[in-house]
């Protein structure tokens, strides 16, 4: 487990530290592009992650400010199909499913099949 943590830290630091290229004479062509506050925040985050790993906690138990915001798919409403009377939907199950899937709401086949029964 120690080797995996070391590899994780190396990968995180190399991918999180962007470098800018400068062609000034007498300077290294690569210099860190992070400000000291950003570097300190990165070190603090890595320290917290390593401490949690050492305690045996899963990585999902991170502090709330370190979690990524969850992306939720917006709910799509289909007024033109959902508000049609049941009698008009019963033009045949296949026709109903076809109209439901092509109404522009982005419903799946299973969702349309459930609505049409």
Curated annotation (Swiss-Prot):
UniProt KW keywords: Cleavage on pair of basic residues, Disulfide bond, Neurotoxin, Secreted, Signal, Toxin
Cystine links in this protein are 96-116, 100-112
Q: Does the keyword Repeat apply?
A: no
Region called Disordered, residue ranges = 53-86
Superkingdom of source: Eukaryota
Composition skew (Basic and acidic residues), residue ranges:
62-80
Localization, UniProt: Secreted
Q: In which tissues is it expressed?
A: Expressed by the venom duct.
Q: Which residues form the propeptide?
A: 23-90
* Gene Ontology molecular-function annotations: toxin activity
UniProt similarity note: Belongs to the conotoxin R superfamily.
Q: What else is known?
A: Negative results: very weakly inhibits potassium channels in PC12 cells. Very weakly and reversibly inhibits Kv1.3/KCNA3 in HEK293 cells (Ki=12.1 uM). Does not inhibit Kv1.1/KCNA1, Kv1.2/KCNA2 and Kv1.3/KCNA3 when expressed in oocytes (tested at 10 uM).
Free-text comment on this protein's domains from its UniProt entry: The cysteine framework is XIV (C-C-C-C).
Q: What is this protein called?
A: Conotoxin vil14a
Species this protein is from:
Conus villepinii (Villepin's cone)
- Which lineage ranks, top first, belong to the organism behind this chain? Eukaryota, Metazoa, Spiralia, Lophotrochozoa, Mollusca
């Amino acid at each position: 487990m120690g080797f995996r943590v070391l590899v994780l830290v190396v990968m995180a630091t190399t991918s999180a530290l962007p470098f800018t290229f400068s062609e000034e004479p007498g300077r290294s062509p690569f210099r860190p592009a992070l400000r000291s506050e950003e570097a300190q925040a990165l070190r603090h985050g890595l320290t917290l992650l390593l401490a949690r790993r050492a305690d045996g906690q899963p990585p999902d138990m991170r502090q709330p400010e370190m979690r990524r915001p969850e992306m939720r798919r917006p709910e799509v409403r289909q007024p033109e199909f959902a508000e049609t009377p049941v009698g008009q939907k019963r033009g045949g199950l296949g026709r109903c499913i076809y109209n439901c899937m092509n109404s522009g709401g982005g419903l799946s086949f299973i969702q349309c099949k459930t609505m049409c029964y």
